[in-house]
């Protein structure tokens, strides 16, 4: 004997259908953040410090990978050609002092920020305009002008 369909059964089927769609969408979204740690490491070793720091917010695996001292060492030493000591010696000193991530966040990152534009006060502005007008006045040639006649 077949069971008769009721309105609640139809509503339940529609609800199940939307749940299936949501689950499949979630699975698609989760796929990118579940990359292999080695693959994530290979990608992250080519990014800048800001991108590396932001990537740690993607997932737990990405966070763990972004905390890797080897990645921060690459970022810190990327632009240093010759620092006067060997790579292993540098690594041992920096790791003893807290690591490359700490070195970057406390010392290198503040230096890499552009300085804010200097704002002139009234005195500086007046002095600059005065010097400009003096230079302009000196460059004027008065020899070509006739002198005013005195009466």
UniProtKB/Swiss-Prot annotation:
UniProt keyword Nucleus, yes or no: yes
- Tell me the CDD domains matching this sequence: F-box_AtGID2-like
The organs and tissues expressing this protein are described as:
Expressed in all tissues tested, including rosette leaves, green siliques, flowers, stems, cauline leaves and seedlings.
Q: Where is the composition biased (Basic and acidic residues)?
A: 1-25
> What segment(s) does the record annotate as region Disordered?
1-27
The record ties this protein, via InterPro entries, to:
F-box-like_dom_sf, F-box_dom, SNE/GID2
**By its UniProt entry, which Pfam families does this protein fall under?**
F-box
F-box domain residues are: 29-75
What are the GO BP annotations of this UniProt entry?
A: gibberellic acid mediated signaling pathway; protein ubiquitination; regulation of gibberellic acid mediated signaling pathway; seed dormancy process; seed germination
Name its pathway.
Protein modification; protein ubiquitination
Q: Which UniProt keywords apply?
A: Gibberellin signaling pathway, Nucleus, Ubl conjugation pathway
Is the keyword Nucleus assigned to this protein? yes
Any one Gene Ontology cellular component term annotated for this protein: nucleus
- Where is the protein localized? Nucleus
Q: Which residues cross the membrane?
A: none
Q: In UniProt terms, what function does this protein have?
A: Essential component of the SCF-type E3 ligase complex, SCF(GID2), a complex that positively regulates the gibberellin signaling pathway. Upon gibberellin treatment, the SCF(GID2) complex mediates the ubiquitination and subsequent degradation of DELLA proteins (GAI, RGA and RGL2), some repressors of the gibberellin pathway, leading to activate the pathway.
PANTHER family, per database record: F-BOX PROTEIN, F-BOX PROTEIN SNE
**Assembly with partners or alone:** Part of some SCF(GID2) complex, which consist of SKP1B, CUL1 cullin, GID2/SLY1 and some RING box protein. Interacts directly with SKP1A and SKP1B. Interacts directly with DELLA proteins GAI, RGA, RGL1, RGL3 and probably RGL2. May have a higher affinity for phosphorylated DELLA proteins.
How is this protein named in the record?
F-box protein GID2
